[in-house]
């Protein structure tokens, strides 16, 4: 193996932790969005002592977070180049892609035209058609579905179309076929849904239970990512949390499921104890799913403080030749209008024990700078997009 500047790279994506409106925020109806800033203000100041030491407030002032006189990390912010503000777009861009057609979300449910087509092609009526929790919608509509055979269609805050059906009412094979039809229909640019999910369930009203026969119809990244290059060159690509789903398993050598942010940090810490060469990549989704979309600044702030408190464990276990990168994939300002993501800059903190004089990094024009830096470090094929900042880390 050739010698690398860093043998292991740990990449943490704090899902939706934006750091202020992007220059093109207005185009996305997100003027004034500021996830971190507004949370800190709402709390009368937020306590993030470990990210403070790394240089979080050196990127820009965050209320309650002290500016570091001698930051321990390189710090900066990144602008999203792609034309979207969803999780898949953000993550795919981090790994070297540029997405010009955004995935769509449907906070009001899916357009009548799409539902009508689905009804015609499946031969079944559709009920629901709104954002909902998968268990709550079964309680609400499960009995009606059993009586009528209508499909329960629902979405979430992500770009997803889910179809729930009782296994004794709609046989699995039929449900899977209907989901394939839905997948086909939603590739149309008007709808562009990231993922279609079959959600079979069993049981009686009041006791419905989802079964393990769930099936996902996702999209593979539209081009090769840095993860594909790493895997093909025999490096380890350990995916923690939602990462494997986001890239539809592409370029991944090991996948660890998680139940929460804290579980995600536990799994990341486990990988710090492993001997491997390559990357360990975690997505902490609770910020987004539990607090951003629900517009709960208090809960969001507490979750950030809990995450920050886990960092000393990470620092302690890091080896001299490890690199830690902390960033985000988009914003989700919990005091902004609506319930959708927000178009923002994302923070970039880059830490290693061997850095002698960390400081500011230039503004990144694309999240792909991270992918380019990782590719540069492991001497694999470079992505088409992104500029490596490896040579700036000293």
Curated annotation (Swiss-Prot):
It is an enzyme of class 5 (isomerase). Mn(2+) 1 binds at residues 15, 329-330. GO terms for molecular function: magnesium ion binding; manganese ion binding; phosphopentomutase activity. Its main location: cytoplasm. Binds 2 manganese ions. Its EC number is 5.4.2.7. Belongs to the phosphopentomutase family. This is Phosphopentomutase.
């Amino acid at each position: 193996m050739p010698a690398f500047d860093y043998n292991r790279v740990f990449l943490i994506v704090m899902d939706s932790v934006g750091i202020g409106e992007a220059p093109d925020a207005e185009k996305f109806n997100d003027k004034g969005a500021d996830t971190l800033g507004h949370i800190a203000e709402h709390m009368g100041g937020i306590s993030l002592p470990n990210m403070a030491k790394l240089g979080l407030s050196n990127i820009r002032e965050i209320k309650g977070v002290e500016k570091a006189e001698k930051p321990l990390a390189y710090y900066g912010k990144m602008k999203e180049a792609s034309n979207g503000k969803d999780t898949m777009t953000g993550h795919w861009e981090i790994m070297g892609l540029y997405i010009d057609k955004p995935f769509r979300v449907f906070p009001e449910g899916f357009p009548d035209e799409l539902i009508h087509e689905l009804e015609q092609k499946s031969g079944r009526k559709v009920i629901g058609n709104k954002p909902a929790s998968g268990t709550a919608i079964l309680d609400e509509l499960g009995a009606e579905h059993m009586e009528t055979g209508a499909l329960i269609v629902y979405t979430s805050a992500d770009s997803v179309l889910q179809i729930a059906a009782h296994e004794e009412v709609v046989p699995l094979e039929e449900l899977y076929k209907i989901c394939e039809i839905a997948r086909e229909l939603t590739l149309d640019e008007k709808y562009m849904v990231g993922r279609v999910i079959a959600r079979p369930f069993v049981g009686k009203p009041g006791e419905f239970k989802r079964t393990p026969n769930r099936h996902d119809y996702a999209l593979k990244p539209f081009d090769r990512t840095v993860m594909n290059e790493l895997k093909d060159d025999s490096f380890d690509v350990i995916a923690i949390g939602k990462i494997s789903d986001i890239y539809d398993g592409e370029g991944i050598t090991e996948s660890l499921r998680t139940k929460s942010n804290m579980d995600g940090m536990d799994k990341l810490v486990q990988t710090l104890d492993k001997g491997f060469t390559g990357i360990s990549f975690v997505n902490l989704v609770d910020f987004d799913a539990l607090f951003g979309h629900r517009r709960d600044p208090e809960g969001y702030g507490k979750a950030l403080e809990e995450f920050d408190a886990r960092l000393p464990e990470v620092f302690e276990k890091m080896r001299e030749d490890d690199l830690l990168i902390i960033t985000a994939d988009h914003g989700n300002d919990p005091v902004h209008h609506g319930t959708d993501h927000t178009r923002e800059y994302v923070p970039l903190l880059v830490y290693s024990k061997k850095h002698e004089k960390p400081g500011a990094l230039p503004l990144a024009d694309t999240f792909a700078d991270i992918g380019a830096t990782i590719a540069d470090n492991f001497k694999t094929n470079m992505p088409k997009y992104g500029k490596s900042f490896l040579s700036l880390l000293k």
